[in-house]
Amino acid sequence: MREGGRRASCTIARMFERTALAAGPRVISSRLPGARSVSIAAYVLAGSRLEAPGEVGVAHFMEHLTFKGTKAYPTTRSISEAIEGVGGSFNAATDRESTVYWVRVPRPEMARGMDVIGELIVRPKLDDADIRSERAVIIEEIRSYLDDPSEYCQILFQTAMFGDGPLGREICGEEADIEGLSPDAIRDFWRLTYRPANTVVAVVGDLAHDEATGLVATAFGSGNGAVPGFAPAPVLPAGPRVRTGRRDTSQAQVAIGVPALHRDHPDAWTLAVLNAVLGDGMSSRLFLSVREDLGLAYDVSSGLVDYADAGALEVSAGVDPASVPAALEAILAELARLRDEPVPETELLKAKRYLSGGLELRMDDTRHVASWIGGQEALHDRVLTVDEALARIDAVDAAAVQELAGRLFTDDSLRLAVVAPARYLRGLERRLRLPA
């Protein structure tokens, strides 16, 4: 229904409402009566996909710099004390299509929490001295990823799947990228993208929508202007079939996957159920087969990544280097099984209940609700209520899962990344074949 220009929807006896402030953020809120906390999630629609040549790593650098100080909170310490001093928590994360800042505070401190979020986004200092010191911190972060075989394998898989463009490269960039970023380039990126009108703010707790909207208006003010779009995703897969990294480790890291669906694809919920059957959780097929039955891995799971115009399904595992061929064979067999056989009804029901139950449990936490409504408002074509999402999960049937698996799981689509000692990296491409 529409009331006063706002659209309201039920989410299991709860409501969310939207308001687009004039030349300011879009506000979406959900009232949770009796909640003792208020969570705020602010999505700046600026991620690494917006980086121009010569700016690689600037979105992540910008996120780091906001925590160095703002006009009202001039130091990292004053920012952290403002939130932690009342028992709250806060953080931020840069993705390829957005950067999210979140805070969770006791309800009486919600104005303080909103003020800090607004300061971080709209009024950061961006001093030269802070840029110099944070540059060194980010370089150490990059080195830590390269030294971690699991992280390094993910970096290799991204380039195998998405190529060397914005979706394939590491969000942090490489050392040379960070060394080459000038203070002016960082400030220009902030001016171009960190605008109130380029932000979605989700507020969840025991407060009315008008109250949430007022807090956002006070903290963010206004600031409009066109923000450039990002280049379209390449045709996937866009990189080499196999990427390898040599590391003298006692465990090999394996990532294997296929192109999947963009986030608003009509079959997105079918893909979520397929993934739950395949490798999401300890009762999934991969866990029971690769770990429990064959004893080939300690960690094995599957997951999804989705963007506005692209996506991928990935299986990752840590195995004995000598067992890489056997692990690949077992993983590929499970992909082929989904392609060739309908999922039994009892197993399908279990996977759907796993997804539905997990979603409902998360709705008791203000931070998860803020992520649910804020992430959808920022990144999707629509905001589903929880009931609507549950209905879409329930509507998935075995025939749809098998049909989708048949479309996704083909030999030409497979991409593989492995990090292991050099002698275990030979001959991998010939093993990258699904059973007939």
Where are these regions (language model features)?
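Phosphate/diphosphate-binding glycine-rich loops and adjacent basic-rich segments that engage nucleotide
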Residues: 240-250, 254-257, 266
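Active-site-flanking beta-strand signature of metal-NTP-handling nucleotidyl enzymes
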Residues: 39-43, 254-257, 416-417
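N-terminal amphipathic/basic-hydrophobic helices that include classical n-h-c signal peptides
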Residues: 1-14
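Charge-rich, well-structured scaffold segments of protease-associated domains
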Residues: 12, 16, 20, 31, ...
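A conserved active-site cap/scaffold subdomain adjacent to cofactor or substrate pockets
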Residues: 271-280
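M16/MPP (pitrilysin/insulinase) zinc-metallopeptidase core fold and M16-derived inactive scaffolds
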Residues: 34, 39-104, 280-296, 307
